[in-house]
Amino acid sequence: MKCIFHCDLDGRCAGAIVAYFTNNYNKEDYYEANYNDPLPIDSYENKETVYLVDFSFTEDTKHYLDTLIKKECKIIHIDHHTSTMELYENHPEYAKLEGIRSSEHSGAALTWMYFTDTKDIKDCPLFVQYVSDFDCWHWKMKETENFKFGMETVSNYGPLSMIWTKFIKEHYNKYTETIEDIIKKGKIAKKYSANINKEYCKNFAYVTEVEGNKCIVLNKKDGGSLVFGDLVKEYPMSMVWAFDGEYYQYSIYSQDPNIFCNKIAEKYGGGGHKGAAGFRLEDMPFKKI
């Protein structure tokens, strides 16, 4: 068994759910990746079971699916990104793949639903609901943001981390001690982060243009659009980026009904949602204007 998952809270949670229900905690079987990172599927065995959770594919990256199909792998593709929805719409031959493709809930929520045959998000564990509420930008739950910041205080929340095992065990035992502790830590972390980000934006945020749209930019990859605070409301788009030594990694965001972040990201080889997407480049074309 192999599992490829997206490199964010939702993807790691989805990977953790795979680990729990398959009882596979072998680190070598899990691969964290961004939208257009190279995937190690050439090393996968023929007829191997491969979970692709919270992971988007586009016209430029569907060759990975084709390779897995040629290898006669059992593919379980669970995803909620707009890019994936459009790919499946344009290529009905992929509809035969096992899994769930739906934009209604996050990748982690869909992964839980897949393994447990759960239909209603409210029947998912509380931690899954928080992850989905944040990742889909629904903000229907009071403590969602505090939970997100609290998770960032955890030194390791990869899919094999004990934090997920605690969450799941507490779900089945009908108590929420660990989640409550995470939320308490998140309240403190959020206040600290807001103060730091406000000063950081004051000194380093700048405005560029992305596909004809004014965009507020910050060289700070973690935190997403939340790093801008109220400043994000003044521009139709926002962008955070970081250089990893080889590539510039970009995340873009927008609440403008006329801006499709996934379409912009796909032009650069990436993908994602209408309101949030990502890609990477070898250069930095988004200069200050």
What is the predicted role of each segment?
Residues 1-6, 215-219:
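Short hydrophobic beta-strand segments
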Residues 2, 26-77, 231:
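N-terminal small/polar loop signature for handling phosphorylated ligands or for N-terminal nucleophile
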Residues 7-32:
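N-terminal G-site helix/loop of the GST-like fold
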Residues 8, 18, 54, 79, ...:
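Divalent metal-coordination and catalytic microenvironments
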Residues 11-15, 107-108, 228, 261, ...:
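Short, highly selective alpha-helical patches that border small-molecule cofactor pockets
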Residues 48, 187-289:
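Gly/His-enriched, cation/cofactor- and phosphate-binding structural elements
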Residues 82, 88-159:
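Short alpha-helices
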Residues 135-221:
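Glycine-rich, Lys/Arg-enriched anion-binding loops that position phosphate/diphosphate groups
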